[in-house]
Design a protein with these regions (language model features):
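Small-polar-interrupted transmembrane alpha-helices in polytopic inner-membrane proteins
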Residues: 12-23, 68-84
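Short, charged juxtamembrane terminal tails flanking transmembrane helices
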Residues: 120-125
Length: 125
């Protein structure tokens, strides 16, 4: 079943806005709350974004598998822009390690979403 633009895109756009907001903070989240490791935060943020972007791009169920790569690429580009954005925020830096963690999250989110769709397609068959 196809869903409308107004139902598919807002979650991804809101999540991207939340990432931007967190990246705009002078002190990283991990420094405020040591119990939440920064490493896991990066992976989680971008895993969720990749899954939400895949959901947004996959309006037609017959084309869902073809939207995994574009969702990953869009997430990777957003992660790169997020790292560049952090260069201009006081007390923040951009590092290749953080970008790598963002990409790991994007890969994880895309993979889990693809696995989920395959599993549910097989159950329907």
């Amino acid at each position: 079943m196809r869903t409308s633009f107004s139902l598919r895109w807002p979650p991804a756009l809101l999540w991207a806005t939340a990432i931007f907001y967190l990246s705009s903070q002078s002190r990283p989240l991990g420094r405020r709350w040591p119990s939440l490791p920064s490493t896991l935060a990066h992976v989680f943020e971008f895993a969720v974004l990749a899954a939400l972007l895949h959901r947004a791009l996959a309006a037609d169920p017959r084309r869902r598998q073809r939207t995994v790569a574009p969702a990953f690429v869009l997430t990777a580009l957003y992660a790169a822009s997020d790292e560049v954005h952090q260069v201009f925020v006081p007390e923040r830096t951009a590092t290749p390690t953080e970008y790598g963690l963002d990409l790991l999250g994007a890969l994880l989110g895309s993979s889990v979403r693809q696995w989920w769709l395959r599993r549910h397609r097989e159950e329907e068959a």
